[in-house]
UniProtKB/Swiss-Prot annotation:
It is an enzyme of class 7 (translocase). Residues 12-240, 264-503 form the ABC transporter domain. CDD domains: ABC_Carb_Monos_I (cd03216), ABC_Carb_Monos_II (cd03215). It catalyses: ATP + H2O + (2R,4S)-2-methyl-2,3,3,4-tetrahydroxytetrahydrofuran-[AI-2-binding protein]Side 1 = ADP + phosphate + (2R,4S)-2-methyl-2,3,3,4-tetrahydroxytetrahydrofuranSide 2 + [AI-2-binding protein]Side 1. This is Autoinducer 2 import ATP-binding protein LsrA. Its main location: membrane. GO terms for molecular function: ATP binding; ATP hydrolysis activity. Gene3D superfamilies: P-loop containing nucleotide triphosphate hydrolases. It comes from Shigella flexneri serotype 5b (strain 8401). The keyword Membrane applies. ATP binds at G44, G45, N46, G47, A48, G49, K50, S51. It is a peripheral membrane protein. PANTHER family: AUTOINDUCER 2 IMPORT ATP-BINDING PROTEIN LSRA (PTHR43790:SF2), CARBOHYDRATE TRANSPORT ATP-BINDING PROTEIN MG119-RELATED (PTHR43790).
Length: 511
């Protein structure tokens, strides 16, 4: 039986943690504490040091100095195996599953014999409301389900310290509520949770304490109930931010190439009764100079539709018209040359070559247009142009994409798509897992792109994002678009959610 003194000990106490990369101080004497049964939310801007701190706690990266006190014992450094033995589990922002193994094999992989319990796994699946076929390949899951599998892996390991990095980034509101219910059950058993997120309403809903990191330090820390939203946002982004791109940024962002210019409102991409894997009888028109929102719950068929438009999946019926010409039989490369560009939702597995240089990644879609040999100087100049336009933070063009923060990786992916001179740009979850500051940058960027008469199809599970950004909105429900486009005052979160859940009655906007 534990004494009161033992119970009072924090699960985790990081003291004076320092870390440096290539002479740059990433962490500057961080102190961070997590108690039993507590959710401690960790926020911060792009490159604030959140991921580095969590990697040190999880044993992935060693600290230069400082100590970790876990269960009353001090450690100068940990390995991943040792961290697991101490009950620490990091659920990454980008799920790291074995795609060729089954869901069951992924959940049980690496477990000690005493933790191998099929009944326990089935109970957890039922508690989370997961309808998985355990024998299906993990590679067949969408991002939201892969996130759930990662969380299950941590819970199956009897983790006492659970680190969740943007766990709800790809979850629907219903899935988020289900996850939070399960987390509350874990908290009741004494588990402590570090919750990394940029969604302030969710943080206020679940977190007991909040710490904000900025420039490698803790800029703000306290009880959630005692911190105002203004305090938190000011701590994350102290500098005054512009509401639109500066004139200099707009100059650098002028799209390259001899891209055909369409008049505003000209149909660029038209879908006529499309049917494919995960959707059926979808019709819509995307016009030049507009941002068309495509909303819906996870599993509604939006990503499947986008991948079919780009030629990554087989079209079973209907016609795709780009600039008035049918492109059904064209390859992905041919569609790209015609001006159809796709930004996928999973930047790490589908969007970027993480081991290639930043300059190579930005120019990856246009290399074949420049001849057989890569032109390093030209690639570097292209990267520099987008660095100025998008505020991308990096040290040198040759560094690998995997060395950047998630927000900067997303900006590199956007730059890659823009360099292909799009006429129609499909962006799937463009702000998933990026910080408040970078999210604002991306919003400004999308508006600037549309202002150059590019037709933008915005796919997002964030209904507030759709409301903020879209000129018109279509909502998919179970693979179909059952309503005409929402416009004007009908573009609001409540109406979008009603349609997404299959409500046939559209609620009128209030006066």
């Amino acid at each position: 039986m534990q004494t009161s003194d033992t119970r009072a000990l924090p699960l985790l106490c990081a003291r004076s943690v320092y870390k440096q990369y290539s002479g740059v101080n990433v962490l500057k004497g961080i102190d961070f504490t997590l108690h039993q049964g507590e959710v401690h939310a960790l926020l911060g801007g792009n490159g604030a040091g959140k991921s580095t701190l969590m990697k040190i706690i999880a044993g992935i990266t060693p600290a230069d100095s400082g100590t970790l006190e876990i269960g009353g014992n001090n450690y100068a450094r940990l390995t991943p195996v040792h961290a697991h033995q101490l009950g620490i589990y990091l659920v990454p922002q980008e799920p790291l599953l074995f795609p060729s193994l089954s869901i069951k094999e992924n959940i049980l992989f690496g477990l000690a014999k005493k933790q191998l319990s099929m009944q326990k796994m089935k109970n957890l699946l039922a508690a989370l409301g997961c309808q998985f076929d355990l024998h299906s390949l993990a590679g067949s899951l969408d991002v939201a389900d892969r996130q759930m599998v990662e969380i299950l892996r941590g819970v199956m390991r009897d983790s006492r310290i659970l680190i969740l990095d943007e766990p709800t980034a790809s979850l629907t509101p219903a899935e988020t509520e289900r996850l939070f219910s399960r987390l509350q059950e874990l908290l009741a058993t004494g588990v402590g949770i570090v919750f990394i997120s940029h969604k302030l309403p969710e943080i206020r809903q679940i977190a007991d304490r909040i710490s904000v990191m900025r420039d490698g330090t803790i800029a703000l820390s306290g009880k959630t109930s005692e911190l105002s939203t203004d305090d938190i946002i000011q701590a994350i982004t102290p500098a005054v931010r512009e509401k639109s791109l500066s004139a200099s940024q707009k100059l650098w962002l002028e799209l390259p190439g001899n891209r055909p210019q369409h008049a505003v409102g000209t149909p660029v991409l038209t879908l006529e009764n499309l049917t494919g894997e995960g959707f059926r009888n979808v019709s819509l028109t995307l016009n030049a100079g507009e941002i068309l929102g495509l909303a819906g719950l996870v599993g509604a068929g939006r990503t499947e539709l986008a991948e079919t438009l780009y030629g990554l999946r087989t079209l079973r019926g209907g016609r795709i018209m780009l600039n008035g010409k049918e492109i059904n039989k064209l390859s992905t490369g041919e569609r790209l040359l015609r001006g159809l560009v796709y930004l996928p939702e999973d930047r790490q597995s589908s969007g970027l070559n993480l081991d290639a240089s930043l300059a190579w990644n930005v120019c990856a879609l246009t290399h074949n247009l420049r001849g057989f040999w890569a032109k390093t100087a030209k690639d570097n100049a292209t990267l520099e142009r987008y660095r100025r336009a998008l505020n991308i933070k990096f040290n040198q063009p040759e560094q690998a994409a995997r060395t950047l923060s998630g927000s900067n990786q997303q900006k590199i992916l956007i730059a890659k798509c823009l360099e292909a001179s799009p006429q129609a740009l499909i962006v799937d979850e463009p702000t998933r897992g990026v910080d408040v500051s970078a999210r604002n940058d991306i919003y400004q960027l999308l508006r600037s792109i549309a202002a150059q008469n590019v037709a933008v199809l915005l796919i997002s599970s964030d209904m507030e994002e759709i409301e903020l950004m879209a000129d018109r909105v279509y909502v998919m429900h179970q693979g179909e678009i059952t309503h005409s486009a929402l416009t004007g005052r009908d573009i609001n979160v409540e109406t979008i959610m009603r349609v997404a859940f299959g409500d046939s009655q559209r609620q009128e906007a209030s006066c």
